[in-house]
Amino acid sequence: MKHLAAYLLLTLGGKATPSAADVKAVLESVGIEADSDRLDKLISELEGKDVNELIAEGSSKLASVPSGGAGGAAAAGGAAAAGGAAEAAPEEAKEEEKEESDDDMGFGLFD
């Protein structure tokens, strides 16, 4: 991620195709050591591609991925089918928590 962030920073700064040396210089300016293997792979993958087009393409791919909102409803349905015994246990645990929290009321740390 740090290599990609430095690459994007350079493109925002006006350098259309940053080199590995450019990215390495940005990282070293803030005290981060660059990994040459990862940096070379990043440069080769992004060579000849427009960063703005890649971002737009990635955004459209992410938009098509389900966010998982429907998965919670299915899990809740399975928990409700477990029966009344499962519902009684959490209520007892909540009551115990209330009792424990009342023990500390009115006591100061440095009294």
From Swiss-Prot:
Listed A to Z, the keywords are: Phosphoprotein, Ribonucleoprotein, Ribosomal protein
Superkingdom per UniProt: Eukaryota
Q: Which HAMAP family match?
A: Ribosomal_L12_arch
Which family is this sequence assigned to? Belongs to the eukaryotic ribosomal protein P1/P2 family.
Write out the GO cellular component annotations: cytosolic large ribosomal subunit
Q: Name one GO molecular function term.
A: structural constituent of ribosome
Put simply, this protein is called Large ribosomal subunit protein P2
Q: Which CDD domains match?
A: Ribosomal_P2 (cd05833)
Q: Keyword Nucleotide-binding, does the record have it?
A: no
